[in-house]
Amino acid sequence: MKKKKNGMGAAADRGRLLALAHHDKLNPTKPSEAQRRFKPSILLLLGSSLPRLVPPLPSSFLPVVIKQTEFHQRWLVGDLNPPPPPCHLLPIQGQGQMQMQQRRKPPPAAAPVAAKQPSPRRTPGPLSFAGALLSLLVVATFLYINDHGNMMPPHASPDPDLRLLQEAAHQKVNSILLSRHAPAPPPRTNTNTSSSDQHLRLINIPMSSDLDLELGGNSTSSSGVEIQFEQQQQQEEKNLRGCELYKGRWVYDAAGREAPLYRESECGFLTEQVTCMRNGRRDDSYQRWRWQPEGCDLPSFDARALLERLRNKRMMFVGDSLNRNQWESMVCLVQSAIPYGQKTLTKFVNNGSLNVFRAHEYNATVEFYWAPFLVQSNSDDPQVHSVRDRVIAWRSIAKHAANWKGVHYLVFNTYIWWLNNFQIKVLKSRGAPFAGSGGWSSRYALVDRAIAYREVLKTWAKWVDRRIDPNKTHVFFMAMSPNHFMPEAWGGSAGAVKCAMETQPIVNRTSGGLDIGTDWRLHGVARGVLRSMRRVGVRFVDITALSELRKDAHTSVHTLRQGKLLTPEQQADPRTYADCIHWCLPGLPDTWNHFLYAHIVAHAA
């Protein structure tokens, strides 16, 4: 009887609650009597109306729920409007009341059965209610955070990293150049060379017209070359005959059809000194400029064709680190045509002065020999040669020249090591340069740089004329490789430092030429000595003027210093550490070797 009475009392309370709620619907402006008196009952009603989701709320637990905060306490007495309903726990009015009542009423037929045979029920505990309440709070919190996040202003960006900005600016160069230049045109013909590239950027070089570039020679073609290949090379010889290879323009090859000739990642023989991209450079635009001679085309570089010319032969680069730079380029150009396991590189042969790349299938070698002055000097050690006080023996060449015998293609250079001083120290003794206990003799004379350069080349030319068989050996002399230390020479900005951050060639060359520090006296000396040679014809590869435009192609701060990569702090100090002498690879030295290839193909044909 007691349980029945309690049930009737609860029903009466719900009836009064619904009546007051209906009255409040007609007067919604003020806190209702039902809200003030029956808010705890509303919560109990919600709890009892969802028996399968939320068990009835224990009376001992209710104060903990409704009195958690001062805000809810004030709401219970009607001092505040109801808080935003995270889970719609508001008084149910109107149609919602009827739906609640309908859900609470059991089916008529099921009521007696349920009364007679009540199903066993586990008494719900506070933990089950707490779990349901926690789930509702999690959902409400998620919805609140989502809405709140949409209204919040975006977080402020952190202060920019200047180094990252520099790298980003460097990286944008490729996209800018690609937007400025159309894709490379179809293969050019000699009769339409100028018009085919009119839509591309052209950088012209004014040159004197007295260059003797008529190609020919006494050597015969290599044996074992296919007839089709011979016909192709003969046609290329006709294309080159009478062509001024070194007068022309730089053309940006946006499509990359002809430049670069290989990828940095594809050549495992490159040293860290020249791998600029691997060392942190962000743009590769310096790799995409190709040289377009005036009035002709360079033959397409064919590594297999060159290896056929080198079959059973030796090619050797002799000189300073710029010739080593070019030698590395040549190794990368030919190695792509050689299968894995059929190519090797041996360094520091013959007391360290000789490096040998060998293509075993062709029995061919591409070698480099260290001799920065060609004649003997106190800088001849290939690894420890940073000597401030340089001394040369301008009549002593036999020691180095003994390693040049039997070579079929000799490529010489000497220039950059002459630029430290305006005067060179030259030994007075005509004998061996070493005296006494093995040290260099202190008896020397200071000689003007150009005069000493001429005497050294005369010593070298005499050896070539006497020792080289022109029917077996072809000799090339590379002109001066320029440096770029003076931004004011090409109109650089006020804050420009050497060649650092340069990303494009020089485009504002005047008819009088550039003055970037190249010693053109040595250029004239070299040409004069070569013209005086009668027995052996030496090909002068005149790369100086066209290379002066390439301020963008140096290794700059993306290189080594004393055998170690520059640190970020050193890279940030280009005034001290930028290398504006050597060149990135792939890069400008590939063009120099393209000239060699053109001459070798023409001679062989």
Swiss-Prot record:
Q: Name one GO molecular function term.
A: O-acetyltransferase activity
Main location as per UniProt: Golgi
For this chain, the family text in UniProt reads: Belongs to the PC-esterase family. TBL subfamily.
Q: What is the lineage of its organism?
A: Eukaryota, Viridiplantae, Streptophyta, Embryophyta, Tracheophyta
Record-annotated active site: S321, D579, H582
| Segments carrying motif GDS motif | 319-321
Q: Which domain of life is it from?
A: Eukaryota
Q: Which residues lie on this side of the membrane: Lumenal?
A: 146-605
Motif DXXH motif per UniProt: ranges = 579-582
Transmembrane portions of the chain: 125-145
Identification of the protein by name: Xylan O-acetyltransferase 7
Keywords associated with the record: Disulfide bond, Glycoprotein, Golgi apparatus, Membrane, Signal-anchor, Transferase, Transmembrane, Transmembrane helix
Q: Which GO terms describe its biological process?
A: xylan acetylation
Q: Which cysteines are joined by disulfide bonds?
A: C243-C296, C267-C332, C276-C584, C499-C580
User: Which residues point to the Cytoplasmic side?
Assistant: 1-124
Q: What does this protein do?
A: Xylan acetyltransferase required for 2-O- and 3-O-monoacetylation of xylosyl residues in xylan. Catalyzes the 2-O-acetylation of xylan, followed by nonenzymatic acetyl migration to the O-3 position, resulting in products that are monoacetylated at both O-2 and O-3 positions.
Q: Which organism is it from?
A: Oryza sativa subsp. japonica (Rice)
- Which Pfam families does UniProt cross-reference here? PC-Esterase (PF13839), PMR5N (PF14416)
What InterPro entries does the annotation carry?
A: TBL, TBL_C, TBL_N
